């Protein structure tokens, strides 16, 4: 029987949602092993004064198997 743990984190990217998710998973995997999946809870954007998108932000939960 395995036990999993869930952590919540935020990540951002100037390129898009997918890049923000990849960045968050990449940073998490540097210290967290056995990552099994992620849930995107929230997507936000930061805008410039003219309304154009400056940055994409995601809040996500990552689950991993505890040794």
Predicted regions and their residues:
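Short, well-ordered alpha-helical segments
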Residues: 2-36
């Amino acid at each position: 029987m395995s036990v999993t743990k869930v952590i919540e984190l935020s990540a951002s990217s100037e390129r898009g949602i997918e890049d923000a998710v990849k960045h968050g998973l990449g940073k998490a995997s540097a210290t967290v092993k056995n990552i099994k999946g992620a849930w995107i809870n929230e997507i936000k954007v930061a805008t410039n004064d003219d309304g154009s998108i400056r940055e994409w932000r995601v809040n996500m939960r990552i689950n991993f198997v505890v040794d």
